[in-house]
Amino acid sequence: MVYLKSAREVEQIRQACKIFQEAKAYFTIERLLGKSLTAIDQALKQFIESKGATCAFHKYQNFPGFNCLSLNETVIHGIADNRVFGVKDKLTLDIGINLNGYICDAAFTVLGPKAPEPMQTLLEVTEACFTAVVEPQLRPNNPTGNVSHAIQTYFESKGYYLLKQFGGHGCGIKVHEEPLILNYGKPDTGTKLEPGMVLCIEPMVMTDSDAMVMHNNSWNVLTPKSRYNCHVEQMYVITTSGFECLTN
């Protein structure tokens, strides 16, 4: 069942999302480069707690970390460890924030200064998809399948592959709510968008294959047949006239 948020609830979720925006602005390449994933996770935790919030992912479905830190071959759900973010690396920071019971779930990807050019291009294309194809679909009465199909068409037209086993979702009161919004789909199918829906849209993109495997830690999702991958996640609320992006 889809839970529609009231204006008051949307404002509380908006405040949680502001902490994400502040974290994204604070954790620049200079602050991340040369640090272990564990150190980054702890620094993120301290930053979030300094804003009066908590880490929404910690212990959620028994997740052991505080945030999902996905380095290189890990596309999503990475558990922090002692590996170091280096000059040629990709790192996705998927941050869950619980502010007084209201949730922000959003992610951004950063690259070391010597990251390969194909990885740079992939990140640019992924970031651009939100304004290019996602946001034009975010309006009342438009079915979620149109959002999914727009994402699929956009990336496949550029020769990329999409992770099929995971997708976007409702959010705001719980980390994961209905509806599920996959990154592929058929037009005019799924749940119709309504004002008050809060949605996470999160393309997970690979350069060479849509194959994935689970790490033996049961969390890290790996892309062994793809040289590069990328994950970016934004949160939106559907309004009577269209949408508001809560995280950008």
Swiss-Prot record:
- Catalytic activities: Release of N-terminal amino acids, preferentially methionine, from peptides and arylamides
Q: What does this chain do?
A: Removes the N-terminal methionine from nascent proteins. The N-terminal methionine is often cleaved when the second residue in the primary sequence is small and uncharged (Met-Ala-, Cys, Gly, Pro, Ser, Thr, or Val). Requires deformylation of the N(alpha)-formylated initiator methionine before it can be hydrolyzed.
EC nos: 3.4.11.18
Work out whether the entry's keyword set contains Metal-binding.
yes
Q: Name one GO biological process term.
A: proteolysis
Family as reported in the entry's similarity comment: Belongs to the peptidase M24A family. Methionine aminopeptidase type 1 subfamily.
Where a divalent metal cation 2 is bound, by residue? 105, 169, 202, 233
Protein's name in the database? Methionine aminopeptidase
Gene3D superfamilies reported for this sequence: Creatinase/methionine aminopeptidase superfamily
- Subunit structure, interactors included: Monomer.
Q: Which organism is it from?
A: Mycoplasma pneumoniae (strain ATCC 29342 / M129 / Subtype 1)
> Which keywords annotate this record?
Aminopeptidase, Hydrolase, Metal-binding, Protease
Q: How is the cofactor bound?
A: Binds 2 divalent metal cations per subunit. Has a high-affinity and a low affinity metal-binding site. The true nature of the physiological cofactor is under debate. The enzyme is active with cobalt, zinc, manganese or divalent iron ions. Most likely, methionine aminopeptidases function as mononuclear Fe(2+)-metalloproteases under physiological conditions, and the catalytically relevant metal-binding site has been assigned to the histidine-containing high-affinity site.
Binding site residues for substrate: 77, 176
